[in-house]
Amino acid sequence: MVRQLALACGLLAAVAVQAAPAEPAHPMVTEAPDASLLHKRATTCTFSGSEGASKVSKSKTACSTIYLSALAVPSGTTLDLKDLNDGTHVIFEGETTFGYEEWEGPLVSVSGTDITVEGASGAVLNGDGSRWWDGEGGNGGKTKPKFFAAHDLTSSTIKSIYIENSPVQVFSIDGATDLTLTDITIDNTDGDTDDLAANTDGFDIGESTDITITGAKVYNQDDCVAINSGENIYFSASVCSGGHGLSIGSVGGRDDNTVKNVTFYDVNVLKSQQAIRIKAIYGDTGSISDITYHEIAFSDATDYGIVIEQNYDDTSKTPTTGVPITDFTLENVIGTCADDDCTEVYIACGSGACSDWSWSSVSVTGGKVSSKCLNVPSGISCDL
């Protein structure tokens, strides 16, 4: 009996060993995601009223989407949107206003990578520039704040922004790469009254690469676009009214004095001082190359239809050769002067400093023909 019990116990033990489940495999341990980063990516923040500018400056890196709703930016204060987290989306809602102070600005500053800044339907950034306008612009009188610094932006977009009555220059684009601006409206028409607004450039571009501006509507009192330095810049499907037209320059006297590969395409220029202008500063050095104006229509130019000067800033002197203008194309450019006080085409080049120009289907009428053009390149004429 004892032997039988021992045998039975041995069998039960063997069964128990065979039936014991295998130890489960340990799962691979991975590091938990940073909860603070997840929070940042998922956070929508809204800032409004007179304290909104201060709060967004302190909290902007905690937000992936920032709504600026009816913001009232205090006097002497920049709406600080610099150094945003990659991928941040900023949306203006309602009317954004700015307190009055004589200072240089800017009123708004944005920087970062993969940033989107846009205006919601009906949103307005109102500079109320009449508080500063005195006919002097940036050349004297009251110190006036520039409006919007789009500096050090990479792979970013600014779209559907409506800016009204800027005190002085509007967009400063500097140190930017792969930046697209779409459907921007700049309305400074109130500044036409008594010629009080001045130097209200729409887009000033410097030291930037791969910049695209399309669908802009600019009503101002200075350059619609002024490209002082940069490469691969495209401006298209836009309207410029009341200002100084589509400008390269002024080039010279800066750290970077090279403008290369610029295209203006499908632009209407209305009631402006001139439609097309290239400005190389007298006595300075740099280069302007691969410039194309294509499908440009203009009407009622007051001073010039087309003007190219290598003695800008000192037009009483003989043009210099330090900023050559090469590979300059005009194609399908048609426009009118307002009256015979307007010179249809004026070219003032230094000796041998303008070359490889190609103009086709270019017509300017309604003004006077210049007899003072200098060193006009082969195949080009001031009498169209």
Curated annotation (Swiss-Prot):
> What is the enzyme's class at the highest EC level?
hydrolase
Is Amino-acid biosynthesis tagged as a keyword?
A: no
Q: Does the keyword Manganese apply?
A: no
Give the propeptide positions.
20-40
Per UniProt, the keywords (alphabetical) are: Cell wall biogenesis/degradation, Disulfide bond, Glycoprotein, Glycosidase, Hydrolase, Repeat, Secreted, Signal, Zymogen
Q: Which GO terms describe its cellular component?
A: extracellular region
**Which locations, inside or outside the cell, does it occupy?**
Secreted
| Positions annotated as PbH1 repeat | 176-207, 208-229, 254-280, 288-310
Active site, per annotation:
D222, H244
| SMART domains hit by this protein | PbH1
Q: Which InterPro entries match?
A: Glyco_hydro_28 (IPR000743), Glycosyl_hydrlase_28 (IPR050434), PbH1 (IPR006626), Pectin_lyas_fold (IPR012334), Pectin_lyase_fold/virulence (IPR011050)
| Organism name | Aspergillus aculeatus
State the Gene Ontology terms under molecular function.
Answer: polygalacturonase activity
Q: Which residues form a coiled coil?
A: none
Q: Major location, coarse class?
A: secreted
* Listed name of the protein: Probable endopolygalacturonase C
Known function = Involved in maceration and soft-rotting of plant tissue. Hydrolyzes the 1,4-alpha glycosidic bonds of de-esterified pectate in the smooth region of the plant cell wall.
List the GO biological process terms: cell wall organization; pectin catabolic process
The family database entries (PANTHER family) matched by this protein are listed as:
POLYGALACTURONASE
- The cysteines joined by S-S bonds are C45-C63, C224-C240, C349-C354, C373-C382
Which residues bear sugar attachments? Answer: N261
From what superkingdom does this record's organism come? Eukaryota
| Family recorded in the similarity comment | Belongs to the glycosyl hydrolase 28 family.
Matches recorded under Pfam families:
Glyco_hydro_28
Question: What chemistry does it catalyse, as a reaction equation?
Answer: (1,4-alpha-D-galacturonosyl)n+m + H2O = (1,4-alpha-D-galacturonosyl)n + (1,4-alpha-D-galacturonosyl)m
Q: What is its EC number?
A: 3.2.1.15
Where does the secretion signal sit in this chain?
Answer: 1-19
